Amino acid sequence: MLWKKSLSELRELLKRGEVSPKEVVESFYDRYNQTEEKVKAYITPLYGKALKQAESLKERELPLFGIPIAVKDNILVEGEKTTCASKILENFVAPYDATVIERLKKAGALIVGKTNLDEFAMGSSTEYSAFFPTKNPWDLERVPGGSSGGSAASVAVLSAPVSLGSDTGGSIRQPASFCGVIGIKPTYGRVSRYGLVAFASSLDQIGVFGRRTEDVALVLEVISGWDEKDSTSAKVPVPEWSEEVKKEVKGLKIGLPKEFFEYELQPQVKEAFENFIKELEKEGFEIKEVSLPHVKYSIPTYYIIAPSEASSNLARYDGVRYGYRAKEYKDIFEMYARTRDEGFGPEVKRRIMLGTFALSAGYYDAYYLKAQKVRRLITNDFLKAFEEVDVIASPTTPTLPFKFGERLENPIEMYLSDILTVPANLAGLPAISIPIAWKDGLPVGGQLIGKHWDETTLLQISYLWEQKFKHYEKIPLT
């Protein structure tokens, strides 16, 4: 049962030649065949191609030699479809590899599939995929979270040991919480966005899902670092996280923002989080209340900035150069209008309209410009809090995973499921969600937010918690 082994264990076996990359891929392919019909995590499975590629892998010393990885379908993999779960890109084939994919391939990894998401990464439940919803492996009547629901579910059911996602307002951390896995969003600029289909360019960041901290740390190490093709990627040295994670963390101060606890938290989530904090206290962490006075404006700020950037980024899908084109139209203007009307789903249209309004003449200063100023205030609140504490902690989501359809009628309800994750994106801070409990058979995630460029501390606390709680031993659908 190779699919039950962690990435680190697989690495050892592969390095020593005790198993071959082909055998590893076959094992995860078997697991995919057992679970995929129920969960529907993938838009395009690529196990067959990975098996062929596995045969030509020779360099055992590579950091990810023979390791299968699933990839969110808004990240380009050369020669494969990249649909963004949208009708408008249903048949689009990526002409090149995203930088992160290039780095994974160089490290010896094998891409085993493109995973489902909310269309163009806009959503919190993967219900907005134009193709089908992905299901939560812990309860098939509930959502896996979003927008990276497919990536989170694939790691939860172990059809892949690790996966890549993107996080604009919580799209890695929220599904990680709902699916009971680890999900990290690095500092903005830590990982190249070249080849990630843009949603909101000043917020998007690629990150990693996994079941073990060490696994997540290693993959993050491989994909991080400056890239000349992305002007927002930073020339900051990449730590050896795969080694750093095991180092002892002592004497840290953890801040609890009082504003986060003024939101309505589901009792099960509140109880799980309080227990998590008690356990950390026992480990010698000092717990301190901090204040983020402007954080209450995060959701309105985010829902001006993100849709504004999206309306600009999505203007390119007009039926001219690539993607879907309407069949019947009288002139070019009607072609644009029809293509976009038929190609985009309801949530994407909603956000394009919101953004176009916020950027329109006469409203730009009142909305977009003002939101950017509030964003600065939110960032300053975090910087001030980090003068007193090393890490900020909160639940990842205010509720347990919700049922399908429960929030579709009310977009604001859906938006509020990201209320605890959006602030880290606005401030460009690194943040991780780790499984802290199972309540009523459903996973609960705890979020840790770090100082800029300090993913190390987040991973170290995650590793420490994992040693105690051993959440990775729980596997759904077995």
Curated annotation (Swiss-Prot):
Gene: gatA
Enzyme class, UniProt record, top EC level: ligase
Family: Belongs to the amidase family. GatA subfamily.
Oligomeric form and interacting partners: Heterotrimer of A, B and C subunits.
Lineage top rank: taxon: Bacteria
Gene Ontology annotations for the cellular component aspect, listed alphabetically: glutamyl-tRNA(Gln) amidotransferase complex
SUPFAM superfamilies registered for this protein in UniProt: Amidase signature (AS) enzymes
Biological processes annotated in GO: translation
Cystine crosslinks: none
EC number of the protein: 6.3.5.7
Keyword tags: ATP-binding, Ligase, Nucleotide-binding, Protein biosynthesis
Source organism (scientific name): Aquifex aeolicus (strain VF5)
GO molecular function, one term: glutaminyl-tRNA synthase (glutamine-hydrolyzing) activity
Catalytic activity: L-glutamyl-tRNA(Gln) + L-glutamine + ATP + H2O = L-glutaminyl-tRNA(Gln) + L-glutamate + ADP + phosphate + H(+)
Function: Allows the formation of correctly charged Gln-tRNA(Gln) through the transamidation of misacylated Glu-tRNA(Gln) in organisms which lack glutaminyl-tRNA synthetase. The reaction takes place in the presence of glutamine and ATP through an activated gamma-phospho-Glu-tRNA(Gln).
PANTHER family: GLUTAMYL-TRNA(GLN) AMIDOTRANSFERASE SUBUNIT A (PTHR11895:SF151), TRANSAMIDASE (PTHR11895)
Name of the protein in its database record: Glutamyl-tRNA(Gln) amidotransferase subunit A
Active site per the UniProt annotation: 72 (charge relay system), 147 (charge relay system), 171 (acyl-ester intermediate)
